[in-house]
């Protein structure tokens, strides 16, 4: 079968494998690329190519991640796989690899294990919207009742963390046998690919979401008014549209009277573009870096939220010592630092470098935020942690 050229017209979906160590995540990743390449064209990736994950940096944190790509007839997938548990924690919290859906790998020989639970919880906290289960190593279990029991346990665990356990697709397979070319088990990989296509909806593109621009700079242009600059995070801003200025101070309304890029006037600015937006009736001192421009009514300012955070280890350039309750670092959202206080979970006295922990944060100024927003934790400009807003509280 001839290799087809990369079709940009196909919807692009980001997925990844999660689950307990040695349950077969990397073997499954290799099996998916191999079976889909054989069936639909594309490149197969061997286990050792994937397992030898390169180091990358995301927000100053070292993460080992493998990226593979594969196609089904209707979609193009980018898939991440991490070698170690710590890499998953970092990856999910920093959003280095945002997932539109995840494949939870559970070995039928073991059933759910501690990291199975932790990855499901992390998925819930960081906003992984869909999980599909691949029950691996089913070739090693002869007992149908045992398989049903494991399946039931996995469904209960998913439901416990607010995923729809009863309706989650579960595929019974053997990644190793599929990788070895056994047709019976290859069919299970195609079944899994079918669920990726049908169960994970097409992700909404940034440009189709409501307009938001984090303000990086503010200028006053004599005779024209106040211009804010920044990169449009999502949506489109057109000349003549109303906007809200959200965060830090009271929310204000204004109208966009001009959009410019590279000193050229445009009639709109789109997601991903660096633009200047001219605002009607706003004085230079009424607006500042760290606020956002947004479509009215689409985002609110908040000071209190529950978060999932990863604290950098000493080797990553993080703290050398633990911190305790009463810790007051800066929280860096989009373009600015805001000081905040923390509440640790019950029974947790201190947090060590290299830990991941759930904490409630209260900021001294409100920031425009939604669940899923990423942030860095800093001390005097140095990054000591990374986090994600799990739930806005007030």
UniProtKB/Swiss-Prot annotation:
Mg(2+) binds at residue 26. One of its GO terms (molecular function) is guanosine tetraphosphate binding. Residues 174-176 are annotated as: G5. Residues 19-26 are annotated as: G1. Residues 60-64 are annotated as: G2. Residues 10-204 form the tr-type G domain. The keyword Metal-binding applies. GO terms for cellular component: cytosol. It is an enzyme of class 3 (hydrolase). Residues 81-84 are annotated as: G3. Transmembrane segments: none annotated. It catalyses: GTP + H2O = GDP + phosphate + H(+). GTP binds at residues 19-26, 81-85, 136-139. It is found in: Cytoplasm. InterPro entries: EF-Tu_GTP-bd (IPR041709), EF-Tu_GTPase (IPR050055), EFTu-like_2 (IPR004161), EFTU_2 (IPR033720), G_TR_CS (IPR031157), P-loop_NTPase (IPR027417), Small_GTP-bd (IPR005225), T_Tr_GTP-bd_dom (IPR000795). Its main location: cytoplasm. The keyword Oxidoreductase does not apply. HAMAP family: EF_Tu_B. GTP hydrolase that promotes the GTP-dependent binding of aminoacyl-tRNA to the A-site of ribosomes during protein biosynthesis. This is Elongation factor Tu 1. The gene is tuf1.
